[in-house]
Swiss-Prot record:
Similarity comment text for this entry: Belongs to the augurin family.
Function of the molecule: Probable hormone that may attenuate cell proliferation and induce senescence in the central nervous system.
GO cellular component, one term: cytoplasm
Signal sequence, start to end: 1-18
Name of the encoding gene: ecrg4
Keyword Signal belongs to the record: yes
Disulphide connectivity of cysteines: none
Keyword tags: Cell membrane, Cleavage on pair of basic residues, Cytoplasm, Membrane, Secreted, Signal
Segments crossing the lipid bilayer: none
Propiece residue ranges: 19-55, 120-135
The organism of origin for this protein: Xenopus tropicalis
The protein, known as: Augurin
Subcellular location: Secreted; Cytoplasm; Apical cell membrane
Length: 135
């Protein structure tokens, strides 16, 4: 009975892929895959990739005298450097995308103090949670 069972398993295809046992044996006997031929040596490629470094991006060139003057005036008005960078990035991105709330005048899409975002972005949000920094 066992011999008949093994004979059926070995000779009959088990699925649409053919005889599973034969496929397993062929897979075991297969040699190692050959290495792909690359035209550039590995150390040369790594040397090239490691030489590509992005320079640190400044929003505005601080070496220009008018930018230094604006920066000093900004600090004199009581803002810190992080606030300066935030405001610069905000004003420089004005008009780039049309997705701003109320046509690009307000920086935030909804009230920052709200525990959840707006259900409908086209409605006003009145109440005590309004963030007055944006007005």
């Amino acid at each position: 009975m066992v011999l008949l069972f093994l004979l059926v398993i070995f000779l009959c295809p088990g699925s649409t892929n053919g005889n599973k046992l034969r496929l397993m044996l062929q897979k075991r006997e297969a040699g190692e895959p050959s290495k792909t031929i690359v035209s550039v040596k590995e150390n040369k490629a790594n040397e090239f990739l490691n030489s590509l470094k992005r320079p640190k991006r400044q929003l505005w060139d601080r070496t220009r005298p008018e930018v230094q003057q604006w920066y000093q005036q900004f600090l004199y008005m009581g803002f810190d450097e992080q606030k300066y960078e935030d405001d610069l990035s905000y004003w420089m991105s004005q008009g780039r995308g049309g997705s701003e709330y109320y046509g690009g005048f307000h920086q935030h899409h909804y009230d920052e103090d709200a525990p959840i975002g707006p259900r409908n972005p086209y409605t006003f949000r009145h109440g005590a949670g309004v963030n007055y920094d944006d007005y």
